[in-house]
């Protein structure tokens, strides 16, 4: 099944900014996260698809490659390079094509030391941890150099030998009709060396699977989609090649009270209709503790109050955002007889004066005009 276009997956245009990409990814990640959709295979697939798309498009080099070559530019099975895939670079992809047809002298580019693959780890945080910063220990599966053979793949006391088929180049040249075609050596599989006496621990691979426990320092202000790079904590390279990197991708869980949009926080504050009518003072929760909010008389549902500086300080610097509190006026329920009597008395007193409910009065006048025009 063909992969969908990464921009289509995130629902953005090709020229979208990094901020737009991040916002689109955050929306999809929140919507389809497995914690919010347990047992929903479709949502799980969409979550993985969004992760894959954002991993490519949020990296400038990968995005440039994807924009130019499409999925082939970032697909490891097609030779795509870049973090997280550990594949070849693009000169390898297209250089090999011309080498195959015209016998170009690129043999050996695949053999020898190769850099280890980059790894990706999704780190779940609550909102408080993301806003204040934290240090978290994570356990990551990876490939490390085999200690008994020191990464050579050969049993201790022996060494890999030059492949006699390709002479250590890693590729062989074959004649196909009028063309001289260069192909990966079938004996050493492009490594240029063979192991006649493989290590018992790694079976000649030179690397073994292992879990690493790492301490990750998360800076204050991170948000869903942000990445922390741990240099040299990816998979070990082969034949002495450098180790890849580990990218820790942040995913902030949904909060019970606050919603976040960039550096601003939003919450809904329920108030009684009495406080809405007469005004009052409420204690509002913030991430730094409680603050008092004055409610003016005549406050309506939907009225939004701004508490400055009680949002989030962005990870890349700048002042903290604001906390936006939206009022929701509650209608009382389960009234006692006395309470009903008081409300009936209040309703009777209000019916004589339309100035108490200007919106209601205006709405009914509009209805009358509407039917009068029919």
From Swiss-Prot:
CXXCXGXG motif repeats lie at residues 146-153, 163-170, 185-192, 199-206. Keywords: Chaperone, Cytoplasm, DNA replication, Metal-binding, Repeat, Stress response, Zinc, Zinc-finger. GO terms for biological process: chaperone cofactor-dependent protein refolding; DNA replication; protein refolding; response to heat. One of its GO terms (molecular function) is unfolded protein binding. Zn(2+) 1 binds at residues 146, 149, 199, 202. It is found in: Cytoplasm. Its main location: cytoplasm. InterPro entries: DnaJ, DnaJ_C, DnaJ_domain, DnaJ_domain_CS, HSP40/DnaJ_pept-bd, HSP_DnaJ_Cys-rich_dom, HSP_DnaJ_Cys-rich_dom_sf, J_dom_sf. Participates actively in the response to hyperosmotic and heat shock by preventing the aggregation of stress-denatured proteins and by disaggregating proteins, also in an autonomous, DnaK-independent fashion. Unfolded proteins bind initially to DnaJ; upon interaction with the DnaJ-bound protein, DnaK hydrolyzes its bound ATP, resulting in the formation of a stable complex. GrpE releases ADP from DnaK; ATP binding to DnaK triggers the release of the substrate protein, thus completing the reaction cycle. HAMAP family: DnaJ. Belongs to the DnaJ family. This is Chaperone protein DnaJ. The gene is dnaJ.
